[in-house]
Design a protein with these regions (language model features):
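Enzymes that bind and transform nitrogen-containing heteroaromatic metabolites
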Residues: 2-211
């Protein structure tokens, strides 16, 4: 059984007409790591039980990779996002097993200077000025939000552009590993919104950036 706590949240400051939100939707350990030193987070998979999987599939169906949707019974329209941004490390998880467009139901962007050309027509590479390109995407009229999938380096580069955090905290301590943000020290304030807990020990928190 999951428990939801909804806290009163001050509406975020408007930053422009039609501005789309950039949401960092990410899983991490209790001590804030999104993976081991190489970015591997498979140890967290053991906590994905039926109740928690059903919530993720129902609330964030667009975050289920395209090649897995039929297997897990996801056939829903995009609910929060129509665009995904990820670094090469995150993208390579699928690429290494032959999946060139892991989120074919979204507009896909990969931030990398290592790939000379895109492996898939649906995937646009961003080699330079990642912040500028994301600002262009946020300024587009209409549409849904933008999902920042990871990893640490890309999140660090885009930290000032992030409007919302959705953090899935798994009941594990890593001790060391890949941090949520690869960025220099600077305090940045977020306001806590909804909190959801699950019987498997997973805690999901939603935060809004205070500017």
């Amino acid at each position: 059984m999951s428990v939801v706590v909804a806290l009163a949240v001050t509406p975020p400051r408007e930053t422009g007409p039609g501005l789309r939100k950039l949401t960092y939707y990410i899983a991490c350990s209790i001590d804030g790591f999104i993976g081991d030193p190489q970015g591997d987070a498979t140890s967290m998979y053991s906590f994905v039980n039926e109740e928690y999987q059903a919530w993720m599939n129902g609330e964030y169906p667009e975050t289920v990779p395209a090649h897995m949707r039929a297997a897990v019974g996801v056939d829903a329209d995009n609910k929060h996002f129509d665009t995904v941004i990820q670094g090469l490390g995150s993208y390579r998880i699928g690429l290494d097993v032959g999946v060139t467009s892991p989120y074919a139901h979204l507009r896909e962007y990969v931030a990398t200077r290592s790939l000379a050309e895109s492996p898939d027509p649906n995937v646009e590479l961003i080699a330079d000025d990642l912040v500028g390109r994301v600002r262009e995407l946020k300024a587009e009229e209409g549409g849904l939000g933008i999902w920042l999938c990871g990893g640490s380096t890309v999140a660090g580069e885009l930290i000032e552009e992030i409007d919302e955090l959705v953090i899935k905290t798994y009941p594990q301590v890593y001790g060391s590993g890949m941090p949520m943000f690869g960025a220099d020290f600077e305090p940045r304030d977020f306001e806590l919104g909804e909190v959801r807990t699950f019987d498997n020990g997973v805690l999901v928190r939603k935060y809004t950036r205070q500017r």
